[in-house]
A protein has these predicted regions:
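Substrate-binding cleft of extracellular glycoside hydrolase catalytic domains
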Residues: 1-117, 121-124
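Hydrophobic anchor at the start of a short beta-strand
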Residues: 58, 126-128, 150, 290
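Extracytoplasmic Gram-positive cell-surface binding/anchoring modules and repeats
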Residues: 222-235, 269-280, 288-290
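Repeat-associated, polar segments at repeat-unit boundaries in modular proteins
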Residues: 239-259, 286-304
Length: 304
C-alpha cells in the first residue's frame, strides 16, 4: 500500500517537493472537465510539471458532465488533447459523480463509461474509472466496472466495495499534507500501475523491447562453452536473466554425458577399449554405460 493525493486548481500552488518529502508517492491531477479543451484545469500544466520534477508518479482525471455516449467521446477527445505529449504512470480516469448522470440510470452510466474509456484505450491510454462506492454498487454494472482500473471513493476507516478489485481507495477529502494549503483528497494505492503502464507501453510510454529468449538447449551449449560461469555465479546469472536454472543445468548434464560418450565411442573405434566381453568389462569398470557407448559406436560406424 502506498500513499497518494489528488489535486485540482482548488489546491492552488502546490510545493511538490514538500509533498514528496512527507511520504506521498503519487498524485492524480485533474486535467479538466466537460467536452472542450478550453475547460482544461487552470493548474494542470504547473501541477504536472512540478509533480514530475519532484519525482512523484502521476495520473490524471477528467470530470464528466456527459449527457450521452457521444458526449463522453467528445470529453475523451478533449482530455487527450490536453494531456498529449505527456507521460503518466497512473491511469487516466473518467470521473463519474454528477447527479444528473446517475438520475438517468445504470444503462446510461455504463454507456458513458465505456464510451470515454474505450476512446482512450483506442489511443494507447490505460483508462480507469473514478466513482464512489455507493454509486458503483447501484449505478454501474459489475461487468463494466470490472473492465477498468478502479479508483473508489469512500470516506471511512475502510472501503466496503467488494464487487471488483480496486487499485486506489480515496479515503478522505480532509487530508493535510506539507506543501499544500488547506485540505486535500487522500488515497491509498494497491496496484503497481507504473510497472503495468511502462511494460504495456501505455500513457505516452513506449513498450520496452524484450530480448528474444534462448532455448534451454542453446543456453546449455553456452554453459558448456563457459559463457555463464560456474556454481552459484552461474545460477545467479541465469536466474537474473529470467531463465530456469534447474532446467538449463539438467540439459547441460545431458550434453556433457553425450560429449563424454562420443569421446569414448571414438576411442572404442580406434581400438583402445578392446573387443567383445573385454570391451564391456573395461567400460563398466571405468564407470561408463556400456550399452550407451556401444549404441553410439554402432551409429558412428554406420555413418562412416
Amino acid at each position: 500500500m502506498i500513499k497518494g493525493i489528488d489535486v485540482s486548481s482548488w489546491q492552488g500552488v502546490v510545493d511538490y517537493r514538500k509533498v514528496k518529502a512527507s511520504g506521498v508517492d503519487f498524485v492524480i491531477i485533474r486535467a479538466g472537465f466537460g467536452r472542450e479543451t478550453s475547460q482544461k484545469d487552470n493548474c494542470f500544466e504547473q501541477n504536472y510539471k512540478n509533480a514530475k520534477a519532484a519525482g512523484l508518479d502521476v495520473g490524471a482525471y477528467w470530470y464528466s458532465y456527459a449527457d450521452s455516449a457521444e458526449d463522453a467521446v467528445r470529453e475523451a477527445k478533449a482530455c487527450m488533447e490536453v494531456i498529449k505529449g505527456k507521460k503518466f504512470e497512473y491511469p487516466i480516469y473518467f470521473d463519474l459523480e454528477e447527479q444528473s448522470q446517475f438520475a438517468k440510470g445504470k444503462a446510461f452510466c455504463d454507456s458513458v463509461i465505456k464510451a470515454f474509456c474505450g476512446e482512450l484505450e483506442k489511443n494507447g491510454y490505460l483508462a480507469g474509472l473514478y466513482c464512489s462506492t455507493y454509486y458503483l454498487n447501484n449505478f454501474v454494472s459489475n461487468n463494466v466496472a470490472g473492465k477498468y482500473p478502479l479508483w473508489v471513493a469512500q470516506y471511512n476507516y475502510r472501503c466496503t466495495y467488494t464487487a471488483d478489485k480496486y487499485g486506489i481507495w480515496q479515503y478522505s477529502d480532509e487530508g493535510r499534507v506539507n506543501g499544500i494549503s488547506g485540505n486535500v483528497d487522500m488515497n491509498y494505492g494497491y496496484t503497481d500501475y507504473p510497472t503495468i503502464i511502462k511494460n504495456g507501453g501505455y500513457n505516452g510510454y513506449k513498450k520496452p523491447v524484450t530480448a528474444e529468449k534462448k532455448t534451454v538447449t542453446q543456453l546449455a551449449k553456452e554453459v558448456v562453452e563457459g559463457k555463464w560461469s560456474n556454481g552459484d555465479e552461474r545460477r545467479q546469472k541465469l536466474t537474473a536473466a529470467g531463465y530456469n536454472y534447474s532446467a538449463v543445468q539438467k540439459k547441460v548434464n545431458e550434453l556433457c554425458e553425450k560429449m563424454k560418450i562420443d569421446k569414448i565411442a571414438h576411442e572404442v573405434i580406434q581400438g583402445k577399449w578392446g573387443n567383445g566381453e573385454e570391451r564391456q568389462q573395461k567400460l563398466t569398470n571405468a564407470g561408463y554405460d556400456y550399452d550407451k557407448v556401444q549404441a553410439r559406436v554402432n551409429k558412428l560406424m554406420k555413418e562412416q
